[in-house]
């Protein structure tokens, strides 16, 4: 099961619909605090978390850290419209020094997102690092 956290409802809905068309089970939340509460209550159900980086109340890095405290082996993909270089500099390099499995720049070609997510879910030993090119 996949959890999506993005304060942009339209983007979250578009990703959710796309993944559901691939027969994946997806929960989508505009508020990271609500998403965290859901994850906490059903952590064993989730294999993958996709989160925006810049959200109110809690940014994507903080959200990812909380998720990893609950379930350390869950896969996490962060996404942002600002690009990898900007996000890495703005947050003092957390992408390089974290358990984030992948970074995707918005707007996301949905076929690329689906390919990455299916690859990660089908091979949990494969760990994408954000500085490695994604398929």
Functional labels for PLM-detected ranges:
Residues 55:
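Receiver (REC) domain active-site loop signature in two-component systems and cognate sites
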Residues 105-119, 125, 129:
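C-terminal output helix
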Residues 52, 80:
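Active-site residues of response regulator receiver
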Residues 37, 61-73, 93:
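Short amphipathic alpha-helix used as the core "switch/output" element in two-component signaling
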Residues 9-27:
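Two-component/phosphorelay signaling modules centered on CheY-like receiver
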Residues 30-31, 59-63:
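Acidic catalytic/metal-coordinating carboxylates
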Residues 28-48:
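Acidic, metal-coordinating helix/loop segments flanking the phosphotransfer/catalytic sites
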Residues 62, 83-104, 111, 115:
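Alpha4 helix (beta4-alpha4-beta5 surface) of REC/receiver domains from two-component response regulators
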């Amino acid at each position: 099961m996949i959890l999506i956290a993005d304060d942009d409802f339209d983007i979250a809905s578009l990703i959710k619909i796309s993944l559901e068309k691939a027969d994946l089970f997806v929960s989508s939340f505009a508020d990271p605090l609500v998403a965290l509460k859901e994850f906490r209550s059903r952590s064993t159900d989730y294999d993958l978390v996709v989160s925006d980086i810049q959200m109110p109340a809690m940014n994507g890095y903080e959200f990812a850290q909380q998720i990893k405290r609950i379930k350390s082996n869950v896969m996490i993909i962060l996404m942002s419209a600002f690009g990898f270089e900007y996000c890495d500099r703005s947050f003092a390099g957390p992408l390089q020094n974290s358990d984030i499995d992948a970074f995707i720049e918005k707007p996301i070609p949905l076929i690329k997102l689906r390919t990455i997510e299916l690859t990660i879910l089908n091979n949990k030993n494969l760990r994408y690092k954000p500085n490695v090119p994604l398929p």
